[in-house]
Regions:
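Long hydrophobic alpha-helical segments typical of transmembrane helices together
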Residues: 192-222
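Short, contiguous, pocket-lining structural segments
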Residues: 49-60, 87, 114, 176, ...
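Basic/polar N-terminal segments that are highly enriched at the extreme N-terminus
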Residues: 1-15, 222
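Alpha-helical bundle segments that constitute or directly flank the non-heme di-iron/ferroxidase center
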Residues: 22-27, 42-71, 87, 91, ...
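Acidic interhelical loop/turn segments
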Residues: 159-166, 189-198
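Active-site-proximal alpha-helical scaffolds that flank and shape metal-associated catalytic sites
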Residues: 76-179, 210
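Hydrophobic alpha-helical segments
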Residues: 11-18, 100, 125-128, 217
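Short alpha-helical hairpin
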Residues: 2, 18-42, 61, 183-194
């Protein structure tokens, strides 16, 4: 990781999984989208398309958190996932509603939309983790979805003035979000400890990181 160094520890599960995806990871956190978002120069049509597509991860993401409540092997872990579910409803969904209003996106335009192939592929990968009922596979998806965003969100750059730009950054930085990502990393390192074969987890990891990178292109392709 570039701005967060706690996860990349050689010998631990997350550090090992990250090795083969470093190129895509670095390309994602330094993507044109990220640079323009921080600069406040991102075009509304680009951000609009990105957010409309991103909104359709919400159900799959909630399903992954719910599956972690069900399949985590420790009560303390289950409670932490339950806590995060409440945060998503209060803060992240609130941002989407305000952003759609500011960008003049009608409800039908973000609810009834044709999913981009990248969005659909990412959704399918999330739901496959849910269907697996496998805690390690769920954690892989969450560490990438949250850790990669913390990595770019924590860049030491000035925040843009517009709410729709700055708040999307703020949602993916700060002590609370960093603590959440640290928890996910620690959990994956814990459940992966002693696991001799990381092949399946590595395949899922690499696929998810590649999709994260491709997703940033969506608004520019529209």
């Amino acid at each position: 990781m570039e701005t967060q160094d706690y996860a990349f520890e050689p010998g631990l599960t997350v550090g090992e999984l990250l090795k083969s995806s470093q190129k895509d990871w670095q390309a994602a956190i330094n993507h044109r989208f990220v640079k323009e978002l921080f600069a406040g120069t991102i075009e509304n049509k680009v951000l609009k398309e990105y957010l409309i597509q991103d909104y359709h991860f919400f159900d799959a993401f909630l399903s992954m958190l719910g599956a972690c409540v069900a399949h985590a092997d420790q009560l303390e872990s289950k409670l932490r996932f339950a806590k995060q579910l409440g945060f998503l409803e209060a803060d992240e969904d609130g941002y989407f509603q305000k952003a759609f209003k500011e960008l003049k996106v009608a409800e039908n335009d973000y609810l009834e939309v044709t999913l981009h192939p990248v969005t659909k592929a990412f959704q399918d990968l999330m739901y496959s983790a849910v269907a697996s009922s496998n805690y390690a596979h769920l954690l892989v998806m969450l560490v990438i979805a949250e850790g990669l965003y913390l990595d770019w969100g924590s860049k030491d750059l000035a925040l843009p003035e517009a709410y729709i730009h700055s708040e999307w950054i703020n949602l993916h930085r700060g002590p609370f979000f960093a603590e959440w990502v640290q928890f996910l990393v620690d959990e994956l390192n814990r459940v992966g400890k002693g696991r001799e074969d990381l092949t399946e987890l590595q395949q899922r990891w690499n696929q998810a990181v590649a999709l994260e990178l491709a997703f940033f292109d969506i608004g520019y392709d529209a």
